[in-house]
Curated annotation (Swiss-Prot):
The lineage of its organism: Eukaryota, Metazoa, Spiralia, Lophotrochozoa, Mollusca. This is Globin. Keywords: Heme, Iron, Metal-binding, Muscle protein, Oxygen transport, Transport. Heme b binds at residues 64, 95. The keyword rRNA processing does not apply. One of its GO terms (molecular function) is metal ion binding. Disulfide bonds: none annotated. Transmembrane segments: none annotated. The keyword Cell wall biogenesis/degradation does not apply. It comes from Aequiyoldia eightsii (Antarctic yoldia).
Length: 147
């Protein structure tokens, strides 16, 4: 799926707002993901055996959260370019062995959309939920085609 220049600008702007406090945003995303889907926590080696409340301040969790958010940053940077397909293939290859499939990417997208919405609401910034939801549907489909 291709996104308009305005949509790309919107998601990148929202993303910049989130990265102002990347650690807090990352913890919130994973908190939402695991609250909604507790069984997903076992798919993350860095999070196994940790209470969701213990993610914050755990060096292994922090490292993995930054990796995940870095991957999202790569996707946003590659929107509407051929590089996006390369990223999708890589992510599919990295996640399939752990059973992280299209549905898990959709659910992660929902957690990210909720966290971004909360962050934008607190800062008074605009948030285009429909564009973000379309983006994560596209991401899940893009990765899913290689699994």
């Amino acid at each position: 799926m291709s996104f308009s220049a305005a949509q790309v600008d919107t998601v990148r702007s929202n993303w910049c707002s989130m990265t102002a406090d990347i650690d807090a945003a990352g913890y919130r995303i994973f908190e939402l993901l695991f609250q909604r889907n507790p069984d997903y926590q076992s798919k993350f080696k860095a999070f196994k055996g940790l209470a969701v409340s213990a993610l914050k301040g755990n060096p292994n969790a922090e490292k993995h959260i930054r990796i995940v958010l870095g991957g999202l940053g790569r996707i946003l940077g590659a929107l509407n370019t051929p590089e996006l397909d390369v990223i999708y293939k890589e992510m599919a290859s990295n996640h399939k062995p752990r059973g992280v499939m299209k549905q898990q990417f959709k659910d992660m997208g929902q957690a990210i959309v909720t966290a971004l919405s909360e962050i934008q609401s607190k800062s008074g910034g605009s948030f285009d939920r429909a564009t973000w939801e379309a983006l994560f549907e596209s991401v899940a489909n893009g990765i899913g085609q290689y699994q």
